[in-house]
């Protein structure tokens, strides 16, 4: 075998080895991309609102106290109810969350409830990872609840704070539904059908004498 043929063979082997390395690297990149889930949400307007504010001035003559109520649910139903201390009645009630949007690695979020501009209440909410997701993610979002009529001595739901759910068909964490819930559609929403874990944040506007009527 002459020198020219040897050089040709060596160059061919180098070319084959280079192609093999490139293809292997591309295969690893594809595998890594497939393992990382995507997130689907149709809550653009809601996500931009840092604080939810409600006008409760119509109850000032019939209620004197605000009682914070947080109800925790899973797909089996309500698992816990937390009642906060009583606050003096106000014209407005604001609900905010910290961090503003749940961070993937955070397992706790704080909800703040503030009457008018006064100091209010803060409660920590324990989050749960998205079931069936390939990695551990804590992904939650808030949705305001539009109240058709404010009633004293009755639990009034004001905000839904729920977990994303895993869509195995599209390999994504999903949170899609209405930008605002109402008391009429609250139980028919996809959030309630598919969210594996959620909280309903609300209040009882009490006259301090009557029996509280459950939702």
Residue ranges and their predicted role:
Residues 3-4, 33-34, 107, 183-188:
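Polar/charged alpha-helical tracts
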Residues 3, 99-102, 164:
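Assembly/interface hotspot detector across virion components, adhesins/toxins, and nucleic-acid enzymes
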Residues 114-205:
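Mature extracytoplasmic/lumenal regions of exported proteins
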Residues 207-209:
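Short A/G/S/P-biased low-complexity tracts
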Residues 213-215:
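Short, solvent-exposed mixed-charge patches
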Residues 60-142:
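Structured domain cores in non-transmembrane regions
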Residues 1-32:
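Bacterial Sec-dependent N-terminal signal peptides
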Residues 27-84:
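Start-of-domain marker
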């Amino acid at each position: 075998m002459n020198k020219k043929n040897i050089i040709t063979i060596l160059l061919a082997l180098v070319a084959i080895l280079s192609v093999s390395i490139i293809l292997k690297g591309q295969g690893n990149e594809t595998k890594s991309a497939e393992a990382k889930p995507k997130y689907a949400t149709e809550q653009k307007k809601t996500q931009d609102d840092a604080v939810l504010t409600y006008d409760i001035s119509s109850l000032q003559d019939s209620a004197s106290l605000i009682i914070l109520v947080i109800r925790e649910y899973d797909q089996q139903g309500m698992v816990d109810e937390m009642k906060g201390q009583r606050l003096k009645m106000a014209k407005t009630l604001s609900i905010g969350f910290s961090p503003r949007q749940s961070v993937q690695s955070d397992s706790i979020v704080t909800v703040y409830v503030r009457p008018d501009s006064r100091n209010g209440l803060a409660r920590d909410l324990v989050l749960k990872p998205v079931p069936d997701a390939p990695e551990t993610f804590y992904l939650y979002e808030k949705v305001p609840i539009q109240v058709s009529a404010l009633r004293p001595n009755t639990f009034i739901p004001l905000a839904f704070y729920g977990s994303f759910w895993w869509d195995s068909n599209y390999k994504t964490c999903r949170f899609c539904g209405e930008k605002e819930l109402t008391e009429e559609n609250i139980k028919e929403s996809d959030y309630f059908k598919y969210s594996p874990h959620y909280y309903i944040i609300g209040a009882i506007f009490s006259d301090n004498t009557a029996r509280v009527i459950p939702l």
